[in-house]
Amino acid sequence: VEIPGVGSTTFLKTAVNAIRKHRGEKEFDAMEFLKIMREKRDELGISEEMMRRALNVGFSGGEKKRNEVLQMALLEPYLAVLDETDSGLDIDALRVAADGINSLRSPERTMIVITHYQRLLEYVVPDYVHVMADGKVVRSGGKELALELEEKGYSGVGDKAEAAA
């Protein structure tokens, strides 16, 4: 979502401090936040210029995805739902996003990664794979299920899963 008039850095600082306050942690002052944000930004290959722009205004698809991963890195959520994070990314941007996702994996964090393609799963290896059809999980398994889907399609993994195609 584009939000004209709201700077990306201002948005992130406000969001991070709201989370910290909720968790009973000390809020970051401007200098503390900028230091942490720059470290995370550099890890994700996000330019300083991009952070000076209004939130998502004029961002390419890849920039929006990188910004989403930056938000996740800064907010440190307990639960993250990543909906088609690989959509519209070239291979370099996909690797940056995957590296960001992998760097945030921990036993304290649950990530639900929604994708229709195997490509992302070459870089982010799932613990579990679930196939949904009509709002229900129709099949579950490990990373092997994703490989089977790529090879056989939804029709190859059973009648119920065929509806998900």
Residue ranges and their predicted role:
Residues 84-85, 92:
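Walker B catalytic motif
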Residues 90-95, 140:
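Conserved D-loop-proximal element of ABC-family nucleotide-binding domains
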